[in-house]
UniProtKB/Swiss-Prot annotation:
Zn finger intervals (C2H2-type): 277-299, 305-327, 333-354, 360-382, 388-410, 416-438, 444-466
Organism: Homo sapiens (Human)
Protein name in UniProt: Zinc finger and SCAN domain-containing protein 21
Lineage: Eukaryota, Metazoa, Chordata, Craniata, Vertebrata
Record Pfam families: SCAN (PF02023), zf-C2H2 (PF00096), zf-H2C2_2 (PF13465)
Coiled coil stretches, renumbered: none
Family, as annotated: Belongs to the krueppel C2H2-type zinc-finger protein family.
Residue ranges with Polar residues bias: 148-167
Length: 473
């Protein structure tokens, strides 16, 4: 079996002894990009997978902590069973990928297994395009070594030690030379006569050599793919060079001052393939469909990721993750209704709901609102603007929340399920109203007498007592 000397670090990692038969074995050291932040979802997954029993004082605490870490990763309060299943399938799919592909796919942060497959298919098409070729220059041809004796006692002759040129496929012409930078401990077979006796060139049988050269070219193709991945701008591994020492341990060619070889480096990756995914709205192009899907949300205003705590919606899952942390931090500012806030300004905005303070007034009808966003949404009633349209039936809405609720009529989706009684709802506001039955929460209170209510409609009925419009319920 011929030894491959080109590729990424994972490809050139420790191998079985029978495969390490050449005098030119090299070890490539990965250069990790330090200080680069992992995606939030990946960070939570790693915390869950890497949690150790020794991190807790006892088994009960360990189990409790595992539950917390699992919920932070899978987020069952916002994900359906199908979405959680998809996360687990995606994790296992990335696990079974070759390490060089696994690192490349993870850099693109796919949100589903289907998206990961699309990325890999795009990469395959890119590799099949013309121009993705490589050749070894005539003056830099490397010998191909073959192990011909399992006992390690093969005879040697002067003629057998002459290097044979490595014939690469014409498919790889145009990239120029590829070098591998050696690091760590080298395996210097040439300096030990006993090791040299175990290896010699496969020139005894010309027909056998031709067949093996063909298989070496095929093997080189596989390793070239690894080099392509290593050279991608998005990959975490930096470019790597090859530096081969000669038998006497002289200075490597790449490190010779002023030498032509020393000035050569890994060639820049060829221009990537055409960006096939084009936005119909603005004409911007993308290399994969997932990025186009995310970009289109800037035009449609779609926000499919909804916080179950407050109902706020986001266009990207990463933004929802960042927002969700605001519900987990300390909230020193408490309202009489039981809600707490991390900032005093948020408490003041909330209290306007109780005091009915409304500093934002519509110039057309005089109606006032407690928040600026509410005024903007209300103003669309006068302008008739309905920027959110349903793709199924064409119906338009002035608010994204209205579109989201409407679309669930087509899908039948009811993502908000009560853990107490199992009842499901298609909108977070309906779920929150129902949940107060179980918790006894009464967030609406009368500023005249301090009485609290679980719904705003009940508060309105009660306030008629103070205004003289009717009896208290």
């Amino acid at each position: 079996m011929m030894t491959k000397v080109l590729g990424m670090a994972p490809v050139l990692g420790p191998r079985p002894p029978q495969e390490q038969v050449g005098p030119l074995m090299v070890k490539v050291e990965e250069k990790e990009e330090k200080g680069k932040y992992l995606p939030s979802l990946e960070m939570f997954r790693q915390r869950f997978r890497q949690f150790g029993y020794h991190d807790t004082p006892g088994p009960r605490e360990a189990l409790s902590q595992l539950r917390v870490l699992c919920c932070e990763w899978l987020r069952p309060e916002i994900h359906t069973k199908e979405q959680i299943l998809e996360l687990l399938v995606l994790e296992q799919f990335l696990t079974i990928l070759p390490q060089e592909l696994q690192a490349w796919v993870q850099e693109h942060c796919p949100e589903s297994a289907e998206e990961a497959v699309t990325l890999l298919e795009d990469l395959e098409r890119e590799l099949d395009e013309p121009g993705h070729q490589v050749s070894t220059p005539p003056n830099e041809q490397k010998p191909v070594w073959e192990k011909i004796s399992s006992s390690g006692t093969a005879k040697e002759s002067p003629s057998s030690m002459q290097p044979q040129p490595l014939e690469t496929s014409h498919k790889y012409e145009s990239w120029g030379p590829l070098y591998i930078q050696e690091s760590g401990e080298e395996q210097e077979f040439a300096q030990d006569p006993r090791k040299v006796r175990d290896c010699r060139l496969s020139t005894q049988h010309e027909e056998s050599a031709d067949e093996q050269k063909g298989s070496e070219a095929e093997g080189l193709k596989g390793d070239i793919i690894s080099v392509i991945i290593a050279n991608k701008p998005e990959a975490s591994l930096e470019r790597q060079c090859v530096n081969l020492e000669n038998e006497k341990g002289t200075k490597p060619p790449l490190q010779e001052a002023g030498s032509k070889k020393g000035r050569e480096s890994v060639p820049t990756k060829p221009t990537p393939g055409e960006r096939r995914y084009i936005c119909a709205e603005c004409g911007k192009a993308f290399s994969n469909s997932s990025n186009l899907t995310k970009h289109r949300r800037t035009h449609t205003g779609e926000k499919p990721y909804v916080c179950t705590k407050c109902g706020k919606a986001f266009s990207h899952s990463s933004n929802l993750t960042l927002h969700y942390r605001t519900h987990l931090v300390d909230r020193p500012y408490d309202c009489k209704c039981g809600k707490a806030f991390g900032q005093s300004s948020d408490l003041l905005k909330h209290q306007r709901m109780h005091t009915e303070e409304a500093p934002y007034q519509c110039k057309d009808c005089g109606k006032a609102f407690s928040g600026k966003g509410s005024l903007i949404r209300h103003y669309r009633i006068h302008t008739g603007e309905k920027p959110y349209q349903c793709n199924e039936c064409g119906k338009s809405f002035s608010q994204h929340a209205g579109l989201s609720s409407h679309q669930r009529l087509h899908t039948g989706e009811k993502p908000y399920k009560c853990k107490e009684c199992g009842k499901a709802f298609n909108h977070s506001s309906n779920f929150n109203k129902h949940h107060r039955i179980h918790t006894g929460e009464k967030p609406y209170w009368c500023h005249h007498c301090g009485k609290t209510f679980c719904s705003k409609s009940n508060l309105s009925k009660h306030q008629r007592v103070h205004t003289g419009e009717g009896e208290a319920p």
